[in-house]
């Protein structure tokens, strides 16, 4: 399937057409509705519908890939209609209330858009920073969040991402080696660092700085964190972290 996807310039909509799924992308009244896949006895193939209101190109691509998953994954044909809201189509993998079919479709979309072998080969000699995240986002037609998460998931370096709304911590994800250092530590519920404020005030640029680790986690300072923060939507900030040095 990756060969076909490359021929489609990594556009899930075009891949869906190759697979025989008609695709309707339109504006719907609610941002909560992301997409759906509809099966009916009158249809030769299921129809995919996607909502483009408030969606980046990368997010829309993920939504359509998710619906393709519902169309081809084993066991998904037992349900005639999948209506997926933003809580179902989850790039960040932190909604534990999602049912298994939605989780399977999310994993399918992630692996289709950012295949492990190809992505690993590209990132192995790159620095984990926004310059490269944005390049890869454009190359793979994905969102900033998904691209950063996949990098963290596959990396052997001490790296992590933090997602904040305003100054409030919402979730974080660390590489295996980073997580080993912090799996028993609680992130601070409110993160009062200039990076986040400056990123919100200056959404067009990436804010860089170095912080002691105790400004992010409830602990005595052990490491220096090199941080890049960027406002990805309104007051939502995604911060890239790697451990710069031991103290």
Language-model features: locations:
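Active-site hotspot residues in diverse enzymes, especially metal/ion-binding acidic/histidine motifs
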Residues: 1-247
